[in-house]
Amino acid sequence: MLLWSLLVIFDAVTEQADSLTLVAPSSVFEGDSIVLKCQGEQNWKIQKMAYHKDNKELSVFKKFSDFLIQSAVLSDSGNYFCSTKGQLFLWDKTSNIVKIKVQELFQRPVLTASSFQPIEGGPVSLKCETRLSPQRLDVQLQFCFFRENQVLGSGWSSSPELQISAVWSEDTGSYWCKAETVTHRIRKQSLQSQIHVQRIPISNVSLEIRAPGGQVTEGQKLILLCSVAGGTGNVTFSWYREATGTSMGKKTQRSLSAELEIPAVKESDAGKYYCRADNGHVPIQSKVVNIPVRIPVSRPVLTLRSPGAQAAVGDLLELHCEALRGSPPILYQFYHEDVTLGNSSAPSGGGASFNLSLTAEHSGNYSCEANNGLGAQCSEAVPVSISGPDGYRRDLMTAGVLWGLFGVLGFTGVALLLYALFHKISGESSATNEPRGASRPNPQEFTYSSPTPDMEELQPVYVNVGSVDVDVVYSQVWSMQQPESSANIRTLLENKDSQVIYSSVKKS
């Protein structure tokens, strides 16, 4: 009887065990939620309930409860079942086993690069490659790239590619990428890849001069441009003056060229220059460049030179213009009251002259202008007053001399006439009173009578008009004689008592 009772109880327990069921999805994808539901009779009390995976207890409850896996991963794949324990040991129950397989939503990403040994300064393209499951092509992914735990670019992006415009030697290191769903449930990381950036030595260093107008001018800005034809990375540029050998300046930048500026060039800055460039390899030097500094002309000085103490009509006036500073060639312009007279150049610097034959209209202000292409400078005005014509003064002096001679000759003629009359009267008186036997007078004594046709005409024996350098401008010497007859002309010419008239006019 007892045995029969035990068989009845065992049959009842077995019947209840068959009623404990585990409900779970058999196939899920990464990131999906998994709900395990253990179902059984609720008319009897349980001491505990548990969920198991591969014979390992996952979770224990005091009543029937669901077991939730929020986001499935591949490791969640396995055999699941649930169990209950009643108040009596005969009430222990175990559910059916459900095999769950978690499928991969997308493959583990792989980092690829356009080059894993790029040239410094060149671009690099990174790509995070993966593939979605054909059953879940509608899932959206986002990507992020890293170098040595540093996020590259703008961070997470829907694009699986990253373009780096230029990489440098310091960009050498380990790179990887991550891919995740936009819901952030599944995130996968690629393996790390090593990228080594190659540096290229610099080559062909050159020094170039840049100045306003293409020429270096005192007081203006000068730029010394040092450049390299090739090379990568940070380049250190330095500038030198050959005469001193000391560095004028230094710049380090990631560029193929750099500038050194001289704000205001001085005349002493003229000379030879060169530059050097270095990017960590052997420094390279440029060729030496000679830099001439052109000097603008200073304010010129105008000097006037004339033959006499005062300029006069007919004089040759020399206008000399000179700028004490200024690079040649210098062009000089000469002006009379803002009217251009002419120009003259000084190819080697210094001053220049311009000659002007003066007329009465040349009185006024004179000035000059100097220009060597770097700006014109004008001198101060110099006033000039022109006196009367020199030829006119000479004519007046000549006329005065002639009038003076005529006056002297007239006075002399009157005196000679009175002298002749006086001697004639005296002779007649002597002849009347002279005895008949008286002897004739001495042949050397003169008896003046009226002039006869044979009387020798007055002739000048010396005439001279002095040159400009002699004070005497006109002189005459006259010899006046009244011989009794042509026979004694020689005797009279040899007579020391002959009357001689000298006259001369000197320049006042």
Curated annotation (Swiss-Prot):
Would you list which residues are glycosylated?
N204, N234, N343, N355, N365
Q: Which GO terms describe its molecular function?
A: protein phosphatase binding; signaling adaptor activity; transmembrane signaling receptor activity
Q: How does it sit in the membrane?
A: Single-pass type I membrane protein
What InterPro entries would the database entry show? Ig-like_dom, Ig-like_dom_sf, Ig-like_fold, Ig_Fc_receptor, Ig_sub, Ig_sub2
- The stretches that face the Cytoplasmic side, renumbered to this chain, are 423-508
Q: Which UniProt keywords apply?
A: Cell membrane, Disulfide bond, Glycoprotein, Immunoglobulin domain, Membrane, Receptor, Repeat, Signal, Transmembrane, Transmembrane helix
Q: What CDD domains does the annotation carry? A: Ig (cd00096)
Chain ranges on the Extracellular side, renumbered to this chain: 20-401
PTM section of the record:
Isoform 2 is N- and O-glycosylated, and phosphorylated.
List the expressing tissues.
Answer: Expressed in the secondary lymphoid organs, spleen and lymph node. Expression is limited to the mature B-cell lines. Highly expressed in CD19 and within the mantle zones of the tonsil tissue. Isoform 2 is expressed in the spleen, peripheral blood and bone marrow. Isoform 2 and isoform 4 are expressed in B-cell lines. Preferentially expressed in memory B-cells (at protein level).
Q: Membrane-crossing residues?
A: 402-422
Extent of motif ITIM motif 3: 472-477
Sequence motif ITIM motif 4, residues: 500-505
Q: Where in the cell is it found?
A: Cell membrane
The residue ranges flagged as biased composition, category Polar residues, are 441-452
Keyword check for Glycoprotein: yes
Q: Which PANTHER family match?
A: IG-LIKE DOMAIN-CONTAINING PROTEIN, IMMUNOGLOBULIN FC RECEPTOR
- Comment on protein domains: Contains 2 copies of a cytoplasmic motif that is referred to as the immunoreceptor tyrosine-based inhibitor motif (ITIM). The phosphorylated ITIM motif bind the SH2 domain of PTPN6.
User: What's the protein here called?
Assistant: Fc receptor-like protein 2
Look up and give the organism this protein is from. Homo sapiens
Organism placement in taxonomy: Eukaryota, Metazoa, Chordata, Craniata, Vertebrata
Q: Gene encoding it? A: FCRL2
